[in-house]
A protein has these predicted regions:
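Glycine-rich segments within core transmembrane alpha-helices of 12-TM secondary carriers
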Residues: 81-89, 153, 157, 176-206, ...
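C-terminal ends and interior cores of transmembrane alpha-helices
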Residues: 113-139, 347-363, 416
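Hydrophobic core of transmembrane alpha-helices in multi-pass small-molecule transporters
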Residues: 51, 118, 132-160, 278, ...
Length: 458
């Protein structure tokens, strides 16, 4: 009888323990779902602000080269983009210290104004159209103004994007099972800016002219600055102590900030990721100027003068494919191995390169839409995955986002400078350079995957 009572008591205690564990599990799932919904709302507001900014700025990166060429400023567009990404690279070293000193919304707002100045420089250029090339309208003055504002934009871009990585990382850390969904959600909105931006560009360039294009985009950029200023704080009540600790931290000297970024190079995981981050930048630098080349090759003599408008039609599909890929890759990232997905994304770059070469041979305008779709998939997929990998493998480390943006911007600067130096060579030369970096990136990701698999077995 006593034995039966003891067994009953043990069963009751076991059931009670299981019941408590079940309740704790349900409570944890419920809390994570609440954090996910809160985080989703905040990321939605951040995404809309970024989408508005890059609706204004994004189309400029692809069209600016062609637009400035219409005024016989042959390399001005590519040089300004190079100035942006070159300064972006080295400003990334100190971005963490600046973000640490101010609130996210202040950093976002001030950084936004750098983009506004860069866009507004286009107003100055086209105000000088038809006037004597002297004073502030001289060639030297125009090159100086455009490149100065481009460099300012690069400095602001470093703080904007490192802050973006930190903001999203904080929100996604409260619901790790939905990390990929939240980051993919952001980049799908970013890609939507291409659709809106190029539809807007085609309307403005066709019916209102170049001056109106830069003027309205400057206004849109200021609107996004206000949207960023009213953003909510990313910290939830559950992790409010993180915010307090962050504010108490002292800003480290510049030398130490640079060391914090470079010390990551001793980490094998970070070291093998750098070629991948570099490739993402090369992709941006390549299609930002190459889409214009492919489209121009497909046009006849009468259509060439309207090349920027034809480019704007094509890049709408680049944005559409980016939106879809941003959503899809976010969902896949929460279910599958991130490195395998990244390897697949680098192989997608090869497909885009092959069809880009085909576009130069066939010279068919309809094929340019497929080429744009492929480059849009490459850009959105790889941009999303690089942030998800940095956020998952290096949680809470803003310096990893600095290293990521350093590699991105150097890769983009390299592609842009190659675009300038290889202008007298056949346009497919730049594609072979991209292909070379794609191979290196794929090999490094495969080695990193092998190392991780070995660690897991041990």
């Amino acid at each position: 009888m006593a034995q039966q009572e003891l067994e009953l008591q043990e069963n009751f205690l076991n059931k009670d323990t299981e019941y408590n564990q079940l309740n704790n599990s349900k409570s944890q799932i419920l809390n994570e779902e609440i954090e996910y919904q809160i985080g989703k709302q905040k990321i939605f507001r951040l995404s809309i602000a970024f989408m508005t900014l890059f609706t204004a700025y994004g189309s400029c990166t692809s069209l600016i080269s062609g637009l400035y060429k219409t005024l016989n400023f042959t390399n001005l567009g590519l040089m300004s983009l190079f100035s942006t990404y070159f300064t972006f690279a080295f400003a990334s070293f100190v971005a963490k210290g600046i973000i640490q000193k101010f609130s996210f919304r202040v950093v976002f707002t001030i950084s936004n104004l750098g983009y506004t100045a860069c866009i507004a420089a286009g107003i100055w250029v086209f105000m000088c159209e038809g006037s004597e090339q002297s004073g502030f309208c001289s060639v030297e003055a125009i090159y100086s103004i455009v490149n100065f504002t481009a460099a300012l934009c690069g400095i602001c871009a470093s703080t904007l994007w490192v802050a973006q990585g930190g903001y999203v990382d904080i929100l996604s850390s409260t619901c790790p099972s939905k990390r990929g969904v939240l980051i993919g959600y952001f980049f799908s909105f970013m890609s939507a800016s291409n659709i809106i931006g190029y539809i807007l560009a085609s309307i403005l360039l066709n019916f209102f002219g170049n001056m109106s294009y830069f003027l309205l985009n400057s206004v849109l950029s200021l609107v996004s600055a206000y949207m960023m200023y009213v953003l909510p704080d990313p910290y939830s009540p559950n992790i409010k102590s993180q915010n307090d600790n962050r504010n108490k931290q002292q800003i480290k000297p510049l030398k130490e900030q640079i060391k914090e970024v470079l010390v990551l190079l001793k980490d094998k995981k970070a070291l093998y990721l750098i070629p991948y981050y570099w490739l993402v930048g090369v992709i941006l630098g390549c299609y930002a100027s190459y889409i214009f080349v492919v489209v121009k090759y497909s046009l006849n003599e009468e259509q060439v003068q309207y090349a920027p408008q034809y480019v704007s039609y094509v890049v709408i599909f680049l944005g559409l494919s980016g939106v879809i890929c941003g959503i899809v890759v976010g969902k896949l990232a929460d279910k599958y191995n991130l490195l395998i997905l990244a390897i697949g994304a680098t192989l997608l770059v090869t497909t885009a390169i092959i069809f880009s070469l085909l576009g130069l041979i066939v010279k068919e305008y309809a094929l340019c839409f497929l080429i744009a779709i492929l480059w849009g998939c490459c850009d959105s997929t790889n941009s999303s995955l690089q942030v998800i990998i940095a956020s998952k493998d290096f949680p809470g480390q803003l310096q990893m986002f600095s290293l990521q943006k350093l590699a991105n911007s150097l890769g983009c600067s390299f592609a842009l400078i190659m675009g300038i130096l290889l202008q007298s060579y056949p346009p497919y030369c730049i594609l072979f350079i991209v292909f070379l970096f794609q191979i290196i990136s794929t090999i490094c990701l495969a080695v990193l995957l092998s190392l991780k698999n070995t660690e897991n077995k041990v």
